[in-house]
Amino acid sequence: MDTNAKTIFFMAMCFIYLSFPNISHAHSEVDDETPFTYEQKTEKGPEGWGKINPHWKVCNTGRYQSPIDLTNERVSLIHDQAWTRQYKPAPAVITNRGHDIMVSWKGDAGKMTIRKTDFNLVQCHWHSPSEHTVNGTRYDLELHMVHTSARGRTAVIGVLYKLGEPNEFLTKLLNGIKAVGNKEINLGMIDPREIRFQTRKFYRYIGSLTVPPCTEGVIWTVVKRVNTISMEQITALRQAVDDGFETNSRPVQDSKGRSVWFYDPNV
C-alpha cells in the first residue's frame, strides 16, 4: 500500500470511529475500590477481567484491545500529522483511585484535535512499568493523557519514560502524590503543557481502555520519544496506590492484525 493509500485508509478508519456512537467510548474507567488485580494467572487478574463483571466481557473477547507492542514490522509510515494540541492551565485535583494515581482537571485545560474532531483533556494517570512496548521493550513508566469529545469518543496520548533525570512535571506534583492517601487534594492551577513531548514523531492505532471495562474505539497516540523519570518519582507513585497495585500494567494484547501508523514529519 503506497503512502497516499495508507493516508486514505487511516482517514477512513478515523471517520468510522469518530462518527458512530456504538463503537465509541461508552463507559469510563473504573474508579476506586476496584475488584480487579494485575496479578497474572489469578481469578481477578488480567486474564480473568472479562469474567468478573458482564459489562467487562470485551476485556476477554474484544478485537481492538490495548496495550500492544509497537513493532516496526507492523508500522506504516504516514507523513500527514493529522492532529494539533492546544493546552492551557486549569484547576486540578489529585486522587488515589486505588489502582492508580490520577490528576483531573476541573476547568478547561485545552484540547487536541484529530481530523477536525476536538477532544478535551480530562485527566492523566500513570502505569508502572509501561503498558505499551516498543519492539518488545517495556519501559519504566507510562503516562496516559485522557481526552473525550462532545460525542463521547475517547483519545489517549501515551508518554513513555525510562530511569534517568527527574521528570519536571512529576516534580511539581510530588508533594501531592505523597500526601494524597484516600482523599482528593486540590493542586491549584496545573499546566498540561508542562508534559513535554519534545518530538513530533508518534505512533497511532485504534485500541481500548487498558483497565476494565476495556471499552474499544479509543484512538491511541503514543509519543515516540522516551522521556526520563527518577526512581524516587516512580517509588512515590507506587507507594501512593493501594496495596497490590504497586505495578499496574496490563499485559500486551494480541494486535489481531491491526494497523499501526507512525508519523515522522522529517521523512
Swiss-Prot record:
It is an enzyme of class 4 (lyase). Gene3D superfamilies: Alpha carbonic anhydrase. Pfam families: Carb_anhydrase (PF00194). Keywords: Chloroplast, Disulfide bond, Glycoprotein, Lyase, Metal-binding, Plastid, Signal, Zinc. Residues 34-264 form the Alpha-carbonic anhydrase domain. GO terms for cellular component: chloroplast stroma; chloroplast thylakoid membrane. Substrate binds at T210, V211. Glycans are attached at N22, N135. SUPFAM superfamilies: Carbonic anhydrase. Its EC number is 4.2.1.1. Residues 1-26 form the signal peptide. Zn(2+) binds at H125, H127, H144. N-glycosylated. The active site is at H99. Belongs to the alpha-class carbonic anhydrase family. Reversible hydration of carbon dioxide. This is Alpha carbonic anhydrase 4. The lineage of its organism: Eukaryota, Viridiplantae, Streptophyta, Embryophyta, Tracheophyta. The gene is ACA4.
